[in-house]
């Protein structure tokens, strides 16, 4: 299984200063539970924003001398990262950022996307190139949580999309 997971505000924003534009602990806990024990594919900037990085994290960067933490691997392309992540025998999750989602979605059979029911300021948008309208919604549930920056209640819609036909990884 190759899946992607992320969250997006109602105005399409998914990041601000290499982190989330919102502070919703329950949504972050959902992310952590969902990816627990998986191999992760992540872009360099998202990787640098992470306090805790599990083993079997594959960091996509063009910087050949980029040093990663113990248990992680630097890779030059999304395809190489996905191949190496699959070789671990674990489920694989693509966790961002935007350019990594845009490059990886054709290979994903699932996309776990939380839609945050409020606009947020941000500097990174969810990629318009991902045609989720052509995917099948296989799970859809809503919860209301407190967003800690604003103190307001926010609806989080937890969606799981299935892509009926996904692209096989090219042979090495």
Protein language model regions, located:
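Enzymes that bind and transform nitrogen-containing heteroaromatic metabolites
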Residues: 1-172
């Amino acid at each position: 299984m190759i899946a992607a997971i992320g969250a997006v505000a109602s105005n399409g924003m998914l990041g601000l200063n290499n982190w989330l534009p919102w502070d919703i602990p329950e949504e972050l806990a959902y992310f952590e539970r969902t990816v627990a024990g998986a191999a992760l594919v992540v872009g360099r900037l998202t990787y640098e924003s992470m306090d805790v990085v599990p083993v079997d994290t594959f960091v996509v960067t063009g910087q050949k001398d980029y040093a990663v933490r113990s248990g992680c691997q630097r890779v030059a392309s999304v395809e190489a990262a996905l191949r190496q992540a699959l070789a671990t025998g674990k489920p694989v999750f693509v966790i961002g950022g935007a350019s990594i989602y845009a490059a990886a979605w054709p290979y994903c059979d699932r996309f776990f996307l939380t839609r945050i029911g409020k606009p947020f300021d941000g500097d990174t948008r969810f990629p318009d190139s991902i045609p989720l309208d052509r995917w099948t919604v296989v799970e859809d549930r809503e919860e209301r949580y407190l967003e800690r920056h604003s103190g307001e209640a926010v609806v989080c819609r937890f969606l799981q999309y299935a892509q009926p036909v996904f692209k096989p990884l090219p042979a090495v």
